[in-house]
UniProtKB/Swiss-Prot annotation:
Lineage: superkingdom: Bacteria
Subcellular location as annotated: Cell membrane
Subunit-structure text: Forms a stable energy-coupling factor (ECF) transporter complex composed of a membrane-embedded substrate-binding protein (S component), two ATP-binding proteins (A components) and a transmembrane protein (T component).
Protein's UniProt name: Folate transporter FolT
Keywords for this protein: Cell membrane, Folate-binding, Membrane, Transmembrane, Transmembrane helix, Transport
Transmembrane segments: 6-26, 35-55, 71-91, 101-121, 131-151
InterPro entries from the UniProt entry: ECF_S_folate_fam, ECF_trnsprt_substrate-spec
Job description of the protein: Folate-binding protein that interacts with the energy-coupling factor (ECF) ABC-transporter complex. Unlike classic ABC transporters this ECF transporter provides the energy necessary to transport a number of different substrates. The substrates themselves are bound by transmembrane, not extracytoplasmic soluble proteins.
GO molecular function, one term: transmembrane transporter activity
Keyword Nucleotidyltransferase carried by entry: no
Keyword Membrane: yes
Topology of the protein relative to the lipid bilayer: Multi-pass membrane protein
GO CC, alphabetical: plasma membrane
Species this chain originates from: Clostridium novyi (strain NT)
């Protein structure tokens, strides 16, 4: 029964990620600004690295299948998995702290968003990495504090509402 409950919570987070990414985002060919990171970060808090990674990757694949915007590229699925795993490493069974949030968001910004995703976009578009990187660097500089503030606020809210205690009993 406990595993079923975890799967239900995971499905809910996948659904939220798809809705936040596909409907509540601004997207150009090389930049997407949205809030799909919130359910992915919360998955890291609730389920740990591996299950959060599954939520991230599944969200990417299902989102692309249900609401395609261009060709499917597995590199972005890998990026979604890696980003979610990083959230899980920094947030699962940990106390809320600004330092943890800044480290997680910083590593995801540099490793996933600026490095991996820029490489994937270069492969897909053929544009020079330098050109893509400059545009993406501006976007990431704007989004970094937004991500950090929103994730920290969500984590504090989850902590106050004792949601983690309720979910933790299903993870054992």
């Amino acid at each position: 029964m406990k595993k079923v409950n975890v799967m239900i919570y995971m499905a809910f987070m996948i659904t939220l990620e798809i809705v936040f990414t596909r409907f509540l985002s601004i997207q150009t060919p090389i930049i997407r600004i949205g809030f799909g990171f919130i359910p992915v970060a919360m998955s890291g808090m609730m389920f740990g690295p591996l299950l959060a990674g599954i939520v991230g990757a599944t969200s990417d694949v299902l989102g692309m299948m249900i609401f395609p915007k261009g060709a499917y590229f597995p590199g972005f699925t890998l990026s979604a998995f890696v980003g979610a795993v990083i959230y899980g490493v920094f947030f699962y069974n940990k106390k809320v702290s600004v330092k943890r949030v800044l480290l997680a968001v910083g590593i995801i910004t540099v490793l996933v968003n600026l490095t991996m995703n820029t490489i994937w976009l270069q492969i897909l578009t053929g544009k020079a990495v330098k050109v893509l990187f400059v545009t993406r660097l501006v976007k990431e500089a704007i989004m970094f504090p937004i991500h950090a503030i929103v994730i920290y606020g969500a984590w504090k809210m989850v902590d106050r509402l004792e949601i983690m205690n309720k979910v933790a009993k299903f993870n054992k």
